[in-house]
Amino acid sequence: MKANVILCLLAPLVAALPTETIHLDPELAALRANLTERTADLWDRQASQSIDQLIKRKGKLYFGTATDRGLLQREKNAAIIQADLGQVTPENSMKWQSLENNQGQLNWGDADYLVNFAQQNGKSIRGHTLIWHSQLPAWVNNINNADTLRQVIRTHVSTVVGRYKGKIRAWDVVNEIFNEDGTLRSSVFSRLLGEEFVSIAFRAARDADPSARLYINDYNLDRANYGKVNGLKTYVSKWISQGVPIDGIGSQSHLSGGGGSGTLGALQQLATVPVTELAITELDIQGAPTTDYTQVVQACLSVSKCVGITVWGISDKDSWRASTNPLLFDANFNPKPAYNSIVGILQ
C-alpha cells in the first residue's frame, strides 16, 4: 500500500486520538503513541471501514467488545478497538469483588482506566455488573440480615453508578439471576430478600444516573420457548408493571457451534417484553463458525429493539474459552473468516 494512501486512511483515526494538550493518564499517553505508530499495519489486516461504522449504517448503535486495563495495555487490543469497534464492556474491573473485596476499601484504578480510555477515544461503555452472585466479596455473601443487605445494595449501586454518572450508556444492573427453568436463582440476595433485591438495585441505579439504560443480563437466552426465556419474560413484565425501571434485556450469547440459529426466535420473544432495548452482550461461539456469527448479527439487524452487539473479547488467546477459539481474531490478532463474513453482511 502506498504511503499517501495509508495516510489518507489513517487521517480520521489519528484525528480522533487525544491531542497532546489533553492531560492523559501517563499509561494512556504512552499507549496513544504506540497506536499512532502501529495503525498502518492494522489497516492492512482489517476492513477499510470499522464494523462499528458499518452496523451504525444499519441503524444500530454499536459493535463492541469486552476488555480491561491489562488487555488495553497490550497494544494490538487497543488498536483494534480504536480502528474497528465503538463500545467497550469491562470484563472484570467493575464487578463487586474487583471494586470492594474488603468492605469500605474501594479500588477504582482499573475501572477508571477503562472509562478514561473509552472517553478519550469516543467509545460507548456498558457497565458490567452491579449485582451478581459470582465474583462477590465474602463479606457480602456472609450477610444474614435483610435490612443490612438492603442498605448494602443501595450503597454499592449508588456509589458505583454515581461515580460514572453521564459516562456509561448502559448498566447490567442484575446478572444471571435465573435458573434454567426460569425460576429465581438461589443467592444471598434472593434468600434474604426474595424478588425485592431486583427492585432495590434498579431503583438505586435510576436515582444515581437517570440517563443510563438499565439492563437485566443473562445467558442461555438463545432459544424461543426455553424455560429461562419464558421465566425471564414473565418476571420482567411483572416487575415493569410494578414500576421497576428496567430498560433492557441483555442476551449474553455464549454459544456452541450451531447455536446461532435460535437467536432470531429468542430475540423476537424477548422483544414482546415491555422494555425499550435488547442487546447481544457477551457474544462468543465455540469454533467461531461463520454461519453462526452471521446468524446472530442478522438476528440483531432483524429485531428493531436490538441496539447492538458486544463480542466477549478480541483475540482467541485472551478468551475465557480460549481452548475453543470462539472469537473474531486469532491468537496473532488476525481477523478470522467469521470476522470477514460479518463485514460482508454489514456492507
Swiss-Prot record:
UniProt-annotated location(s): Secreted
Propeptide section residues: 17-45
GO cellular component: extracellular region
Superkingdom of origin: Eukaryota
SUPFAM superfamilies assigned to the protein according to its UniProt record, in alphabetical order: (Trans)glycosidases
Pfam families found in the cross-reference section: Glyco_hydro_10
Keyword Signal: yes
Active-site residues from the entry: E176 (proton donor), E282 (nucleophile)
PROSITE patterns xrefs: GH10_2
Main subcellular location: secreted
Subunit and interaction comment: Monomer.
Reported function: Glycoside hydrolase involved in the hydrolysis of xylan, a major plant cell wall hemicellulose made up of 1,4-beta-linked D-xylopyranose residues. Catalyzes the endohydrolysis of the main-chain 1,4-beta-glycosidic bonds connecting the xylose subunits yielding various xylooligosaccharides and xylose. Produces xylobiose and xylotriose as the main degradation products.
Protein name as annotated: Endo-1,4-beta-xylanase 3
The species this protein was found in: Hypocrea jecorina (strain QM6a)
Gene behind the chain: xyn3
